[in-house]
Amino acid sequence: AVYDYYANDKITVLENLTREKLLKLKEVFSTMESFFHGKSSGLDPLNSYLSIPILINSKKDIKVTGIPSQERVGEGAVFLLDSGEVSTTAPMINIFMESMKKDGFRKMLNDKFIKYTNMCVEDFLNGDLSSLFQNTKKLSKVVFDNFKPMIPNKYHSLWQKGIANDSYFLKLCGSGGGGYILGFAKDFEKAK
């Protein structure tokens, strides 16, 4: 709303959203959000402003994408859990930045976290549900093992249970510490 009202040379979703326009919007939103959170990528407000899916390949490679239509009717679901806890971004970013000082953490980030995240995105965009659930399980385990301080304590056993019984897999939204947790279930009724 602030950008919509005050921006000069406003870029709208109705335009041809070139890479350059997306990067400009990302830069503007990064500056705006950094005022509240310290350091921000600008991706969350960009996505909210556009209200369309964007694919982020790297800091400088973002583009508008489509989400495949779901033709199959089944028991699976993507869902959100409200942790009921208010999260403050700065402490979570500090935990992450401290972890980044460790070689093992950086290696895990590149060799596992980024790898499985990218595989999940590809599986989702290609509509490959079998592979999506396999890779989401791997990602969920990597997150639990390496980002545990960012997962609200009351969700630790629930997180592990989903991985152990292969019924649902959880992923942090944003910086973690509270707020929402994204879930993927092969059979939503069983996951409940």
Outline where the language-model segments fall.
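C-terminal nucleotide
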Residues: 7-13, 19, 23, 27-39, ...
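A generic, well-ordered mixed alpha/beta core segment in the N-terminal half of proteins
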Residues: 1-7
